[in-house]
Amino acid sequence: MSPDKREFDIVLYGATGFSGKLTAEHLALSESTARIALAGRSSERLRNVRALLGPNAQDWPLIVADASQPSTLEAMAGRAQVVLTTVGPYTRYGLPLVAACARTGTDYADLTGELMFCRNSIDLHHKQAAATGARIILACGFDSVPSDLNVYQLYRRVIEDRTGELCDTDLVLRSFSQRWVSGGSVAAYSEAMLTTSNDPEALRLVTDPYTLTTDRDAEPDLGPQPDFPRHRGSDLAPELAGFWTGGFVQAQFNTRIVRRSNALQNWSYGRQFRYSETMSLGKSWAAPVASAAVTSVVAGAVGLGNKYFNRLPRRVVERVTPKSGTGPSRKTQARGHYTFETYTTTTTGARYMATFAHNVDAYKSTAGLLAASGLTLALDRDRLSELRGVLTPAAAMGEALLTRLPSAGVVIGTTRLS
């Protein structure tokens, strides 16, 4: 059945989990015209979630589906234009749903931050999804919408100004307040590191800057592109003089998503596009020391985890980390915030900065970004790109999602610096 004639515009799968509940709240508050259903393993838990969502959601149908029973996923996907999924770790639970959406031509969006899940989705399902017309959109939360859309904003502005193509482009996390990590995030990191520590080929792939570009020979040779660089701020932009930056833990994932966006769009950002991510560590007397220390710790933890995580007793890991389904309190979510700034220099020497900021914590923001992605896919279909297959937020939804994000409380914009 054509997606436009299906029973639901959006099915939210995983609605009873921590991120799923937050996403359901955003969808209920959106007051959109979308036909929405909630899905998960337990009808009783789904009813309990729906009861807390307010009057707009009380008529939303409930669907029982389980990743361990692929036929239920395919039946669910066949009823929807769009499936949003918060069920992770995606490395463990995600591929059956990707397969179901690829087979049924259903658009899909997730919150993954797991490189090998992304690579496996591309290798196994990109061609079929492209053939059936499905958009399988990876990383529609804090990983990696801010990274991906900041570069897309810059690309769009540079095209408007006719100032060439993007060259050196650097994201800096300028401010960030996050006081708790969810059990789901820990489980995802653990699963990702378990995969690479058990599989030498997976380890090789995640250390390649172009992990998510399957035609590796088509990528330009731009020399080393370290995942966790440290810089004087002035090396990135004069506006950052006096600041120091260091390794950003999510850079290894986000940078690959951004590079895939460039490749999917026929390298429209530029063939000399070099991209990195760091976090600001301030401009105090201790900032240079903090830059070196943080970068060493982040690079060491990720590198050692990717190689040796399988040697840690799983029971010990589970005992000392947050439980699945847990996350920061409502009060903590409200106190959080973040601001990303992305600086670029073009082939003509013009300089720009893009901003992406949200005045809530990363988890509440993630839910809002996923909900906005779902509404964009369901309601703004005439503004989506023509691309199909396993895609990225910018390549699939760039302009349409940028237009919708301010209504979710996101502050975005570009500034020409010189």
Curated annotation (Swiss-Prot):
One of its GO terms (cellular component) is plasma membrane. The keyword Lyase does not apply. SUPFAM superfamilies: NAD(P)-binding Rossmann-fold domains. The keyword Transit peptide does not apply. GO terms for biological process: glycolipid biosynthetic process. Signal peptide: none annotated. Its EC number is 1.3.1.-. GO terms for molecular function: oxidoreductase activity. It is an enzyme of class 1 (oxidoreductase). Keywords: Lipid biosynthesis, Lipid metabolism, Oxidoreductase. Belongs to the saccharopine dehydrogenase family. Enoyl reductase subfamily. This is Trans-acting enoyl reductase. The lineage of its organism: Bacteria, Bacillati, Actinomycetota, Actinomycetes, Mycobacteriales.
